[in-house]
């Protein structure tokens, strides 16, 4: 058994498991944040209400987390569109060269996908979910909630696409399964793109806050 062990065979599974754990942690953070918000809003009228994401104190840690979230979001957008426009259409192209060629491509794609895509997706979801707990100056909390909702929507639409890929991997190319894969991939690409656009909106609002503070400091001199 030790003679046939190849450590790189387990690496894609490790990346995929890491993504699964990070997405699950994101869901738990979102549920906890929602429960916290409901509890705070249910408190008596005179009690402190949750803010809209404006912090009186600038947090370098929050800004670093935001940079990570935006970077991972746009990495995901780029890889998502590459899969949509290049990788998945090759399934149909390779099927014209026979079952062996199709299976070789399918195996190669599925074995490499987690290495390039899984951890960035998990990091994107986890960083945005964590930002629900870290106020960002001049960034409404509801905007972060929308992005977290889109991250969780990705988790919902991914299994049908994965099932279609799995059927083609085990049974060979099928036009019906391929159409199902592309349909759900359309949804995923739209979700990633929306996340990327909203990430830029969040970053712009945060930078506008920094510029406003700099202008105020200059007027005081």
Residue ranges with predicted function:
Residues 59-74, 136-152:
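Interfacial segments of alpha-helical transmembrane regions
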Residues 169-201, 211:
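Alpha-helical transmembrane segments of multi-pass integral membrane proteins
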Residues 117-129, 191-196:
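Core segments of transmembrane alpha-helices
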Residues 29-37, 194-206:
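Membrane-water interface at the C-terminal end of transmembrane alpha helices
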């Amino acid at each position: 058994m030790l003679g046939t062990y190849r450590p790189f065979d387990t690496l894609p599974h490790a990346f995929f498991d890491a993504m699964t754990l990070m997405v699950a942690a994101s869901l738990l953070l979102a549920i906890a944040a929602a429960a916290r918000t409901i509890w705070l809003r249910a408190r008596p009228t005179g009690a402190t209400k949750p803010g809209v994401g404006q912090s009186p104190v600038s947090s370098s840690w929050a800004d670093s987390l935001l940079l990570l979230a935006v970077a991972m979001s746009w990495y995901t957008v780029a890889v998502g569109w590459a899969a949509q426009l290049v990788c998945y259409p090759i399934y149909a192209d390779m099927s014209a060269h026979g079952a062996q060629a199709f299976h070789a491509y399918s195996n190669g794609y599925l074995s490499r996908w987690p290495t390039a895509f899984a951890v960035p997706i998990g990091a994107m979801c986890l960083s945005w979910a964590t930002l629900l707990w870290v106020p960002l100056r001049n960034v409404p909390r509801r905007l972060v909630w929308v992005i977290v909702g889109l991250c969780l929507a990705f988790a919902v639409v991914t299994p049908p696409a994965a099932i279609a890929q799995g059927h083609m991997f085990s049974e060979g190319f099928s036009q019906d399964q391929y159409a199902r894969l592309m349909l759900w991939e359309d949804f995923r690409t739209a979700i990633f793109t929306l996340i990327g656009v909203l990430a830029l909106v969040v970053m712009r609002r945060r930078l506008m806050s920094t510029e406003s503070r700099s202008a105020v400091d200059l007027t005081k001199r």
